[in-house]
């Protein structure tokens, strides 16, 4: 059922929605195959420090010092950094969908995502996100992470929209639930087809009327 108030704004996650994930377990497993480090040790150290990195409290260089380069390695810091950034790849159909909906309906598009500074800066530039995203509410910029309500409220304040005007798209069901509790419309993204169909129920369709 379409909302009684027109949707003016799309809040959208980046990892596993517009682009692939940046540095999750699958990426660390891939790094193990390339660099041959102790995956269990890296995973444990990453679990203890990555939240601080995503909140903008430590740099990528500091994160790597604590997680990988706390001991001598046969590979360089630069090689690991380049590998990490290279894991980001586009999800072309989702990028096309969001661009097309913005063009057709004049939507504000706001990225609301958890990410580290070096990752998100690379992703914004590499994939041309500024061409269609109006503002970026990123954990490392605002020092708050989903599912904390603070980051959602900041997104609403900065975009200057009411919750009922917003459709929020995220691959994490919990993050969608938080947005819905704040009054936004939510879509749990699991595939392009299901998200496109869900957006259409809010009056955001690319089909000719």
Predicted segments with their positions:
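Short, surface-exposed acidic
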Residues: 35-45, 72-82, 204-209
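Generic structural signal for small/hydrophobic residues in well-ordered secondary structure
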Residues: 13-16, 56, 101, 111, ...
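Active-site neighborhood of HAD-like aspartate-dependent phosphohydrolases
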Residues: 2-45, 182
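Short, acidic loop-to-helix structural element flanking the phosphoryl-transfer center
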Residues: 6, 69, 78-110, 121, ...
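A metal-dependent, Asp-based hydrolase signature
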Residues: 51-81
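Alpha-helical elements of Rossmann-like donor-binding domains used by nucleotide-donor carbohydrate transfer enzymes
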Residues: 26-30, 48, 62, 66, ...
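Asp-based, Mg2+/Mn2+-dependent phosphohydrolase catalytic module
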Residues: 1-12, 116-117, 121-209
């Amino acid at each position: 059922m379409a909302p009684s108030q027109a949707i003016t704004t799309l809040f959208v996650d980046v990892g596993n929605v517009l682009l692939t994930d940046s540095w999750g377990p699958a990426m660390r497993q891939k790094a193990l195959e390339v660099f041959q480090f102790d995956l269990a040790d890296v995973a444990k150290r990453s679990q203890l420090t990555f939240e601080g990195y995503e909140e903008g409290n430590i740099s990528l260089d500091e994160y790597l010092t604590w997680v990988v380069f706390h001991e001598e390695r046969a590979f360089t810091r630069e090689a690991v950094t380049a590998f990490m950034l290279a894991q980001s790849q586009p999800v072309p159909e989702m990028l096309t969908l969001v661009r097309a909906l913005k063009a057709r309906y004049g939507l504000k598009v706001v990225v609301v995502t958890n990410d580290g500074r070096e990752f998100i800066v690379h992703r914004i530039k590499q994939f041309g996100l500024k061409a269609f995203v109006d503002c970026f509410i990123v954990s490392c910029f605002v020092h708050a992470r989903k599912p904390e309500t603070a980051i959602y409220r900041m997104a609403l304040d900065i975009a200057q929209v009411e919750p009922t005007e917003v459709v929020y798209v995220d691959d994490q069901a919990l993050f969608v639930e938080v947005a819905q509790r704040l009054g936004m419309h939510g879509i749990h993204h699991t595939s392009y087809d299901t998200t496109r169909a869900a957006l259409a129920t809010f009056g955001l369709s690319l089909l000719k009327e």
